[in-house]
């Protein structure tokens, strides 16, 4: 493996011949990041971080700025595409055992957390009704921290409630964090290319490698083209598909929406939070739903790396996928039966998958007579 990183990244990188389409999502994520930074810059030029003007400045961008509507929709829907790609990317890592490359996995999960923080701050910026109340509910979870909670919340808000200082600092954070994401992405790619990608069989690919360019670069380009086509179809014909109707009204602290919920890509974590009636317990479960991903490399006990030849793990993996979808759906519903029970069952199943990894590994070793 050559150690000239710049050359290695562009073309000379030796890659296994048998990596499938599931390995394309890294380059798609890089494209999403570039798109978000570019559209975000043009939006920031016209945006005003003031509670009296923020909502009006978004209307000004969509109505008066040339192609402002396209920039705004590309940025909002691009965020959804970003999360679709990152969730598939993580699912592929779980299925094919990519997490055994520990440094790459750890940097990737850190990237996910940074991305989620950036997206949350961005959701608050339009200062719509749902933006305001989602920010109030989520930041208010800090008060669940014993002793420090109230002080931390006041410090984050810049006052005793969400107000102008909160919006200003959220805009500053939303602007600066993408640069942290770019730095972490570079680190992620360098760490990956130290060891090299895994492959669907989980075998050592050193005996059969080909240059990344032109073989895999053209394969990446196909899916990239399809993603951009899909993105522009949504932007052109269904621009409000991911928007909440409440967010078309300006934030009003005196009127609470009937059902407060964040963007769809946070709903699985929000569903886990809501499934626990205790505030501190819910906040801990919310944090653990992401943090548990850090533990996976240390829980792998199977002798085979991917799930390709491990039927029990496959069953649990697809249960996790269906659980993720179900909990996302349940979190869009009001807090009433049967949705409370569905959320609690799916939250339990979600954590069961991660806790069952070592047990399933041992069982599969026994089934295959591997000592």
Swiss-Prot record:
One Pfam family named in its UniProt record: Cytochrom_B_C
Keyword Cell wall biogenesis/degradation in annotation: no
Superkingdom in the source lineage: Eukaryota
Keywords in alphabetical order: Electron transport, Heme, Iron, Membrane, Metal-binding, Mitochondrion, Mitochondrion inner membrane, Respiratory chain, Transmembrane, Transmembrane helix, Transport, Ubiquinone
UniProt xrefs under InterPro entries: Cyt_b/b6_C, Cyt_b/b6_C_sf, Cyt_b/b6_N, Cytb/b6-like_sf, Cytochrome_b, Cytochrome_b_C_euk/bac, Cytochrome_b_N_euk/bac, Di-haem_cyt_TM
UniProt cofactor note: Binds 2 heme b groups non-covalently.
Residues reported in the UniProt entry to bind heme b b562: 75, 174
GO molecular function, one term: metal ion binding
Membrane topology (UniProt): Multi-pass membrane protein
Residue sites binding heme b b566 per the record: 89, 188
Compartments, record wording: Mitochondrion inner membrane
Transmembrane segments: 25-45, 69-90, 105-125, 170-190, 218-238, 280-300, 312-332, 339-358
Positions contributing to a ubiquinone binding: 193
Keyword Oxidoreductase: no
Annotated PANTHER family: CYTOCHROME B
Additional detail: Heme 1 (or BL or b562) is low-potential and absorbs at about 562 nm, and heme 2 (or BH or b566) is high-potential and absorbs at about 566 nm.
Record text on subunit structure and interactions: The cytochrome bc1 complex contains 3 respiratory subunits (MT-CYB, CYC1 and UQCRFS1), 2 core proteins (UQCRC1 and UQCRC2) and probably 6 low-molecular weight proteins.
Designated name of the protein: Cytochrome b
């Amino acid at each position: 493996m050559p150690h000239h990183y710049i050359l290695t990244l562009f073309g000379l990188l030796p890659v296994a011949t048998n990596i499938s389409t599931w390995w394309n999502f890294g380059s798609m994520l890089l494209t999403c990041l570039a798109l978000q930074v570019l559209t975000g810059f043009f939006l920031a030029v016209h945006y005003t971080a003031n509670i009296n003007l923020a909502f009006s400045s978004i209307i000004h961008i969509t109505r008066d700025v040339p192609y402002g509507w396209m920039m705004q929709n590309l940025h909002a829907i691009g965020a959804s595409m970003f999360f679709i790609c990152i969730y598939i990317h993580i699912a592929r890592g779980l299925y094919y055992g990519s997490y055994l490359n520990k440094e790459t996995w750890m940097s990737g999960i850190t990237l996910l957390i940074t991305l989620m923080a950036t997206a949350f701050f961005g959701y608050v910026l339009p200062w719509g009704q749902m933006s305001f109340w989602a920010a109030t509910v989520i930041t208010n979870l800090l008060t669940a921290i014993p002793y420090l909670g109230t002080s931390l919340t006041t410090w984050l808000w810049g006052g005793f409630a969400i107000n102008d200082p909160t919006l200003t600092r959220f805009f500053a954070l939303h602007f600066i964090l993408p640069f942290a994401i770019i730095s972490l992405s570079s680190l992620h790619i360098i760490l990956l290319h130290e060891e090299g990608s895994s492959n669907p069989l989980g075998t050592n690919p050193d005996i059969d490698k080909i240059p990344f360019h032109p073989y895999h670069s053209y394969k990446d380009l196909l899916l990239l083209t399809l993603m951009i086509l899909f993105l522009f179809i949504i932007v052109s014909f269904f621009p409000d598909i991911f928007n909440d109707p409440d967010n078309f009204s300006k934030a009003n602290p005196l009127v609470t929406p009937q059902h407060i919920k964040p963007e769809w890509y946070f709903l699985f974590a929000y569903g886990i939070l809501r499934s626990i009636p205790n505030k501190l317990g819910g906040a801990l479960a919310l944090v653990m739903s992401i943090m548990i991903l850090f533990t996976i490399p240390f829980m792998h006990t199977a002798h085979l790396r991917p799930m390709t030849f491990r039927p029990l793990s496959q069953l649990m993996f697809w249960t996790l996928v269906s659980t993720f979808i179900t909990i996302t759906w349940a979190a869009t519903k009001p807090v009433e039966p049967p949705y409370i029970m569905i959320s609690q069952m799916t939250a339990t199943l979600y954590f069961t998958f991660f806790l069952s990894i070592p047990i399933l590994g041992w069982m599969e070793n026994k089934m295959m007579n591997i000592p």
